[in-house]
């Protein structure tokens, strides 16, 4: 059974913000109701964060907690002490989940996926790039050499792409809405989708892409960014995937990993629907599918 990293402290207080931080608690409640195991992570240490982020940036984050409103100018979120600690905890959760994925074959983080953070700055609600941190930590520990990031958030993983741009051991794949935030960086492979692309546009492209990536790169670990903002009722995006289409998206990734006996760690990424219950349902299904027997992923 897949283990999932979670802390109640993942949820900073961002009143009236478009990012529904309460989704983490709602997803955790759904996982507990399904009998899943949730494990409290330790916060990522400064030493671990320095494998990705510059010391100047980490120092600036600490200073900004003295004037939290400055965070809106760079990250579009308040840079409070609880916010910074939430991001460190979420990075720790991604590290924990990645280690468990290597042991058990699959694991998830009820959080994470902050793919807009660069080595020396944050943006787009993202302060710490936990995807990059987990990869660099596992490489430093000698647990992996090669990794593949499959980023299916509606927005391109620009920070992740930039961090690994010159590293042939880390394959970055992003399939996203082309005409939307952010300014694009160059991933190993980008598929930019037209506005209003739906299930029938999206899923055939993904079915073709994922096996090519895994067979060509042969990663030791697959890092899956299972963003929910491709949902047809998302407030910040114009992709039109149904809930069933998003579940099939997840199955395509998991099926390909299982067929090749590749460990996969899942992070949640974005999701800004009209109803927070919808994003909680989508995210929890992405994590619950990690435990589906192979024969059911059809």
Task: Locate the predicted segments by residue.
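HDAC/HDAC-like amidohydrolase catalytic core signature
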Residues: 1-298
